[in-house]
């Protein structure tokens, strides 16, 4: 045991240790690049954020009708988002959804800030301290009844609406707009809304 301790604490590393350190450095570098890509706050190529945009009209409760799959919402049903404009110009974000695997409602609270003028629907959102990701309203109903949102890439996309369901013709039109922007609409997950959220 003492010999092993001295070996681990030695300033001279073995070839195996050097190999492991090099592998760790590569993994860390790859992770940093991945985080940098995910943390982009600019609209992806081909996507233009809606302008003019009125955050006072946009705030309030939205239901998530469809999304592309990603780890932080995987398996969730009855997903909703509530946006509240703050006095400092930021937007409070509360995302909620039901996790069938655990039988529990889950909630994530974040903060969104405009990346430029508040009349352009391009924001950065954070749920994890200093790490931000892009949130861009790419299409919006004139009456603010539905919205198509794209993240830092077109691999992140959501269709939101004020109601749990919208007319099929309207749904098809939104999907067509998403497809034109480069979103893989065949991969969209349509969210079920069968439960009453106790928070609403």
Feature-to-residue mapping (PLM):
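A beta-rich soluble binding module of mature secreted/lumenal proteins
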Residues: 2-5, 24, 34-200
């Amino acid at each position: 045991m003492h010999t092993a301790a001295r070996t681990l604490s030695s300033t001279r590393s073995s070839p195996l240790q050097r190999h492991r350190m090099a592998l760790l450095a590569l993994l860390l570098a790859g992770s940093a690049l991945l985080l940098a890509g995910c943390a982009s706050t600019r609209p992806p190529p081909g996507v233009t954020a809606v302008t003019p945009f009125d955050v006072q009209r946009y705030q309030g409760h939205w239901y998530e009708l469809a999304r592309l799959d990603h780890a932080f919402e995987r398996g969730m049903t009855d997903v909703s988002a509530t946006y509240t404009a703050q006095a400092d110009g930021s937007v409070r974000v509360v995302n909620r959804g039901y996790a069938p695997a655990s039988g529990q409602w889950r909630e994530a609270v974040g903060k969104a800030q405009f990346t430029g003028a508040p009349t352009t629907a391009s924001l950065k959102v954070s749920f994890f301290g200093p790490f931000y990701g892009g949130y861009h309203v790419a299409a919006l109903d004139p009456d603010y009844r539905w919205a198509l949102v794209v993240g830092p890439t077109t691999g992140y996309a959501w269709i939101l609406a004020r109601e749990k369901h919208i007319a099929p013709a309207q749904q098809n039109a939104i999907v067509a707009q998403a497809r034109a922007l480069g979103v893989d609409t065949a991969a969209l997950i349509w969210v079920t809304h069968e439960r009453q959220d106790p928070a609403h």
